[in-house]
């Protein structure tokens, strides 16, 4: 009767991912966060379509919406109307809704690419340090300590100030996006690296690693075919939790005029411009601020739920 049910049907086991999905489906808060994340991605992807239907081009001026004496939008609460769902910017009358929608593209693109870079660097460094140990582990761990102690914000401001308008065959927004991805990703990899190193230290003592060694498997094969698949869950969890941190960092850099430059819309850049007008045009600051808040909250809720689903012991 082993392996058979009462009616003779075979009992099928469930994989880690099936079990995790079952747990995640029961977590309504995480599902809500995941739904918002998916919605934000769709907004970023289809920004031109959304703006064409509901707004105006993000760089288009609308001086007819501006009071010529006060230089602020006509009407209540920053000129909110059916044509301008989030109101208009002071001075030039650009559509705040369109700029918030297009700003999601920059924020999410930089956050995802920077997270990908940091995960690649951190995973490779963490696996090598945890598997080999000894002086290799010491060297990589001390390198992580140096990066973690580095004043990242000051470095970003200094580097962005000396980078020319054209470099490495890139220019304009493309160059600034690449610069932000490099700065954020290159200096945040130790956070992932430390976590993966700890997991690798535990895995290298497991029986399947000893079995692979006894069968003559070389270190690269053990690293990439035995250890990495077993590290997929923590990599996915902490990547999801790193994305909102990178969104905040990109917004901070744009707020300080270090990131993508105007007139290209970014959430942090809009907040920076809004500091001069928040008393008389609060919508200019409110909506990009809400966009950052909702995005970061959604990613954190989904990441926490994903962590609980894949590793219930972390609760």
Where are the regions a protein language model picked out?
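Amphipathic cytosolic juxtamembrane alpha-helices at the membrane-cytosol interface
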Residues: 94-109, 113, 133-141, 201-205, ...
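Generic hydrophobic transmembrane alpha-helix motif, especially the helices
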Residues: 84-86, 117-122, 130-131, 136-201, ...
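Short alpha-helical transmembrane interface motifs in multi-pass membrane proteins
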Residues: 106-110, 125, 141, 178-182, ...
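Transmembrane alpha-helical segments in multi-pass inner-membrane proteins
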Residues: 161, 165-167, 172-175, 179, ...
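Non-cytoplasmic
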Residues: 154-158, 162, 181, 191, ...
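Residue-level hotspots within pore-lining transmembrane alpha-helices
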Residues: 105, 147, 151, 186-190, ...
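Gly/Trp-centered helix-boundary motif
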Residues: 1-119, 123, 127-128, 135, ...
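Transmembrane helix-loop junction
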Residues: 52, 130-131, 161-165, 198, ...
């Amino acid at each position: 009767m082993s392996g058979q049910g009462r009616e003779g049907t075979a009992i099928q086991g469930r994989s880690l991912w099936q079990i995790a999905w079952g747990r995640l489906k029961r977590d309504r808060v995480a599902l809500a966060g995941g739904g918002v994340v998916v919605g934000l991605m769709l907004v970023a992807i289809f920004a031109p379509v959304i703006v064409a239907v509901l707004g105006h081009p993000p760089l288009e001026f609308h001086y007819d919406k501006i009071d010529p004496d006060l230089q602020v939008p006509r009407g209540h609460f920053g000129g909110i109307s059916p044509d301008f769902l989030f109101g208009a910017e002071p001075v030039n009358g650009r559509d705040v809704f369109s700029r918030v929608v297009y700003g999601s593209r920059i924020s999410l693109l930089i956050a995802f690419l920077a997270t990908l870079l940091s995960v690649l660097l951190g995973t490779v460094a963490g696996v090598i340090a945890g598997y080999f140990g000894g002086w290799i582990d010491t060297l990589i761990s001390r390198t992580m300590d140096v990066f973690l102690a580095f004043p990242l914000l000051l470095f970003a401001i200094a580097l962005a100030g000396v980078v020319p308008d054209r470099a490495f065959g890139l220019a304009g927004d493309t160059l600034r996006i690449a610069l932000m991805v490099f700065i954020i990703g290159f200096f945040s990899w130790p956070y992932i690296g430390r976590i993966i190193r700890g997991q690798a230290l535990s895995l290298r003592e497991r029986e399947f690693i000893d079995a692979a060694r006894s069968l003559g498997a070389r270190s690269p094969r053990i690293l990439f075919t035995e250890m990495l698949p077993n590290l997929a869950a923590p990599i996915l969890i902490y990547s999801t939790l790193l994305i909102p941190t990178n969104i905040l960092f990109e917004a901070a850099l744009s707020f300080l005029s270090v990131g993508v430059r105007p007139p290209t819309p970014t959430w942090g850049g809009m907040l920076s411009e809004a500091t001069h007008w928040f008393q008389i045009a609060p919508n200019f600051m409110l909506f990009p601020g809400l966009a950052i808040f909702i995005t970061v909250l959604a990613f954190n809720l989904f990441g926490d739920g994903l962590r609980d689903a894949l590793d219930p012991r972390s609760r």
